[in-house]
């Protein structure tokens, strides 16, 4: 919770984002996109809370998703609570439950 808003974050309390160009259960952020928007990666041994799942990326890795929406970090966020990626190019948004 930040400024009265509830949003998703990783274990280090960094803000997570969703990408409008993704489809449910499918990431469309690779190469240069994934450098700026690192996918939140997971593994098969992870204990996931309700609503979270793992999706397989075309590069073979497992990415954490919430309600089937792949989750990402933003390379310009420097500390917990930063939300500088919200609204970038009109297609990136803070992930919310």
Model-identified regions with their sequence ranges:
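Compact beta-sheet-dominated domain cores in extracellular/mature segments
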Residues: 1-97
């Amino acid at each position: 919770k930040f400024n009265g808003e509830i949003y998703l974050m990783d274990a280090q309390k960094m803000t997570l984002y969703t990408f409008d160009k993704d489809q449910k259960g499918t990431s469309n952020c690779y190469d240069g996109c994934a450098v700026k928007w690192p996918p939140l990666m997971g593994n098969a041994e992870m204990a996931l809370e309700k609503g979270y799942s793992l999706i397989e990326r075309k590069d073979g890795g497992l990415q954490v998703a919430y309600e089937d929406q792949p989750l990402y970090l933003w390379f310009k966020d420097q500390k917990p609570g930063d939300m500088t990626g919200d609204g970038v190019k009109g297609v990136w948004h803070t992930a919310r439950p």
